[in-house]
Amino acid sequence: MTTYNLCIPRVFNTFDESQIRTTFEQLNFGHIDKVVIVRKKNEKFNIAFVYYRKWYDNENAQRAIARLENNQDIKIVYDTPWFWKVTKTNPR
């Protein structure tokens, strides 16, 4: 199975790696290797990347993978009604 890594192009600059990791761990997509935030100076938003070591074989992960393979984004609700539009990065 291809291991997709994810990009969150717009993350409020108040979020840290731990908060993003916790949100994605709750989705149970797979085993997260690391979360990296690219900080933008004097901006309200940063860019974040979620790197997976392995994706799980469960319904939630399969739905996400199906969307990613069709070059569609995934809507991740982190605090109702707030959400991130998440896209794939290049596979490892």
Predicted feature descriptions by range:
Residues R63-I65:
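"Short basic amphipathic alpha-helical interaction patches in structured regions
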Residues R67-R92:
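Low-complexity RS/RG/RGG-rich segments used by eukaryotic RNA-binding proteins and nuclear co-regulators
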